[in-house]
Every structure is written in C-alpha cells, then in structure tokens.
C-alpha cells in the first residue's frame, strides 16, 4: 500500500485543508503516515502569507526533497504558495513532481495515481469560484482528540491593502449553518469537547448567503449540541463585533469568554491606508465595551509595525495604545511587501526600523502579559489536560487559552491525569506567557 505523508504549514485554516486531503487519500485507499522517512509520497501544504512564511515553505520543500534520496518517490506541493507562484515552483524547484491549487485538494488522490502511472511535472489548477468544504467530504482530524477546528467560511472580501489572501483564496464564501452543525455533531459523537471556529473573518459569517451576519445564530445552535464543552471563534474583525454577538457570548456558558481581534494598527491614517474598515475611536470603544461586559475575559490581538509611510509618531501612537489597552495576548508582525497588493506600491519602511519597532512592541507586551497573568494567581479554572512537557509536568489550557497560539498552564497533580481530561486547578505562579497551577 502506498504511504502518504503530510507536512502542514501556516495557520489552522491550512491545517483543515490538510485534514481534508488526508481524508481524501485515506478514502482512496492510501495509507497516511506521520513519518516522512516512511512515506512513498510527501505532500507539503504551504503558507504564502508573508515573506517569512514563504521562506519557511521553500525551506521545508527542500528539506522534504532529501527523502527522495531514500524511500520517497514523489513530492507534491499545494497550499497558498503553490496557488500564488504556480508558474515558478516547478521551474525553480525541480525536486517537485506536482503542484495543486487551493481549490483542487480533493483531486490529490488522482494526482498521486497519475504520478505512479508515469506522468510528471503535473500542475492542477482551476479558475472556479472559492472552494468550500462540506461535512460530507472525508476528513482525517490531525489535532488531539479533545479539540477540532471547523472552517466556517473560505476566502475574504475585506481587501486589506497589504494582504494577498483574497488573491489566493478568492471571495468570502460561507458554509450553510445546517452543514456546520452536522459536522459539529459528528465531532461531538467522536468525543471532541472543544470546537474552534475559524475563517479569514469569522464575524462576517453568513453575510453572503443569508444577507446578514449569522455568527451569533451559529453559536446559539452549536451550544445546543450535547457533549461539546467549549466553543471558540477566532479571527474577529472589530467593526463586526456588535451587541448581539457580545450578548450571545455572555449568555452561552459553552462559548468561551475569549476574543481574538486582529486590529493591526491604531492610527487613523495608517488604518485608512491599510483599507481597514474601522477607526481608532471604534477600536478603543470596543475594548472598553468588551471589558465592561464580562467579569473575566481575554482579548487577543495582532498588530503590524513598519507599514509603508508609518512615521515615528504614528508608531508611538500604536505603542502608547498597546500600553493603554493591556491586551492579554498580542502577536506582532513586521510588514511584508506582497506583490500585487496596493501597499506594495507605497514608499516602504526600511528593515532596520521595522525590527526596532517590532522589538519595542514585543518587549512592552512581555511586561503587560506578566502583569495580566499575575492577576490570575490564586484563581481557580477548569482546564483541559493536553499532555506532558519535556520535564514530565502536565500541560493544560483553560477557556482563556486558544490551542497552539497561546501560553500553557503547567499543572501539578498527585494523581494520574489523561489527555483530554478536564480538571479544576488553582493558579500558584505566573510567568510572561505561562501559568503554574495545582489540581484541587
């Protein structure tokens, strides 16, 4: 039996795509292996969002190509990098045997068969509208047994001036609510306790097919499914977080009190240049509304430094805003010039300035994170055990930590704990990103 190995790079949305391709391959009779050295075929699902991600994708392709000197017969590249640079990959990377676009993932088993039949240098792309998966498609979940992602929409209509995702993924296309509910029910029946909703923009869910935002309705329906303990949604846009959504999050116990809101910047001129649909005043007002609506809530954000023409004063405005907002979690990016985007044609900020601003923001956030975490000492939280770390301590998350992107809670326990088990811990100590607690 042909063994197929997968490497999934980038975001959780890409991971869902990898899970669908793994499911399609398994259904077609291939064996899925987690070990590249055992694979007859290696599939790399690439990321192409920013320059660092592109470089990681290229480095991974070259690393996996080394296995062609051993057991691996074919190397296949798919994902955002292949969609964006389909004319360059086969030419510049002769080790690659086939490339697929982001809309052709279900064709992967057929591509593998064609390679075994003697075809080579295959390019499989389609100009059809955005691909959206359904609950009836095969999917092999790669996350631990206690949480799973559900991609509720594909593509993006926001057209931020720095972002190439709409060029790669197409227009915003929602899945139907009934189909999402069907998938969530199946996950619940299979034992998954946490559902994480993801999309390029979860807060615009439903606008294209229902002519109104339907995330609040979706959360309500998901909360009615038995055995699901936590429901989380990521990638919220500030202009779409309204009172209806806040009230739903507040009123539904299963919906975690956690908001992931990438704001990118706070200066109004920069926001306008970014083609963001919000304002400094709107962002500040939203943060105050969220914090006043909940007894305890976590806000995560992402900011970008070094955007074209960003002045020192405009960066200082962002810096002072971060100091004021005291985000629980903050990710920072240095602006990446993406060809084909409006921002790429603006006067660019030099790399040295970008690095300095990036480091200043991260140093500030480390202090804020420690301050926020220390406020959690002596509090009690229900957590899910994820496993053990290299020191054999248990690691866990509460509702206030999203999987993969946030810190962890190191847990001491006198009894044996199992991955996926929910226990209550008391927080004993705090660090910049992690907490320490004991089972009570």
Swiss-Prot record:
One of its GO terms (biological process) is tRNA modification. PROSITE patterns: MTTASE_N, MTTASE_RADICAL, RADICAL_SAM, TRAM. Its EC number is 2.8.4.4. [4Fe-4S] cluster 1 binds at residues 11, 47, 80. It catalyses: L-aspartate(89)-[ribosomal protein uS12]-hydrogen + (sulfur carrier)-SH + AH2 + 2 S-adenosyl-L-methionine = 3-methylsulfanyl-L-aspartate(89)-[ribosomal protein uS12]-hydrogen + (sulfur carrier)-H + 5'-deoxyadenosine + L-methionine + A + S-adenosyl-L-homocysteine + 2 H(+). Residues 2-117 form the MTTase N-terminal domain. GO terms for molecular function: 4 iron, 4 sulfur cluster binding; aspartic acid methylthiotransferase activity; metal ion binding; protein methylthiotransferase activity. This is Ribosomal protein uS12 methylthiotransferase RimO. It comes from Caldicellulosiruptor saccharolyticus (strain ATCC 43494 / DSM 8903 / Tp8T 6331).
